[in-house]
Regions:
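RNase III-family endoribonuclease catalytic core
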Residues: 1-94
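Short, conserved loop-to-beta-strand elements that form functional interface hotspots
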Residues: 79-88, 94-124
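Short, low-complexity, polar/charged sequence segments that are solvent-exposed and flexible
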Residues: 8, 21-23, 99-103, 130-134
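Short, structured patches in soluble enzyme cores that scaffold and shape functional sites
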Residues: 6, 115, 136-138
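Structural signal for hydrophobic packing residues in well-ordered secondary-structure cores
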Residues: 32, 36, 65-72, 100, ...
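A broad, structure-centric signal for solvent-exposed, well-ordered loop/edge residues
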Residues: 11, 16, 48, 113, ...
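C-terminal edge-of-domain segments
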Residues: 124-142
């Protein structure tokens, strides 16, 4: 199964991971945690903990959103680069944006998604990997 940004993408390939392996939501979660100086996804949801085996990344991100909100943070903006040769991201951008916005309690206008390729170079170009980079901007309410 291939999940990108919480959306199941039709593909003969999938990702490996302790959870559902969604590289987009994992990167979003890590970026938000980093922006709030609250650690990382591996600290919060260890792959040694069986209760997180095969868990949907939408659930993990939802738990982090609750934690940051409880600590007075709000997401201002998410800028997301999805780097993959296949599948092409363009036709899934709106679905992914809406899914992430709903989980994060923000407007879809606060999320920007870009699909990139490596022009067939490296493991991503050979369709053996997917990468995702995310910059998260947060606001602390005092």
């Amino acid at each position: 199964k291939l999940y990108l940004g919480g959306i199941k993408i039709p593909s003969p390939l999938g990702t490996l991971g302790h959870s559902d392996g969604d590289p987009v939501l994992h990167a979003v979660t890590d970026a938000i945690l980093g922006a709030c100086s609250m650690g990382d996804i591996g600290e919060k949801f260890s792959d040694k903990n069986k209760k997180f085996k095969n868990i949907r990344s939408t659930i993990l991100l939802g738990k982090i959103i609750k934690q940051i909100e409880d600590n007075g943070y709000l997401i201002n903006n998410l800028d997301i680069n999805i780097i993959t040769q296949k599948p092409k991201i363009q036709k899934y951008k709106k679905l992914i944006t809406n899914c992430i916005a709903k989980i994060c309690n923000i407007s879809s206008s606060q999320i920007n998604i870009k699909g990139k390729t490596t022009e067939k170079l490296g493991v991503i170009g050979k369709e053996k990997a997917i990468a995702c980079e995310v910059v998260a901007s947060v606001i602390k309410n005092d």
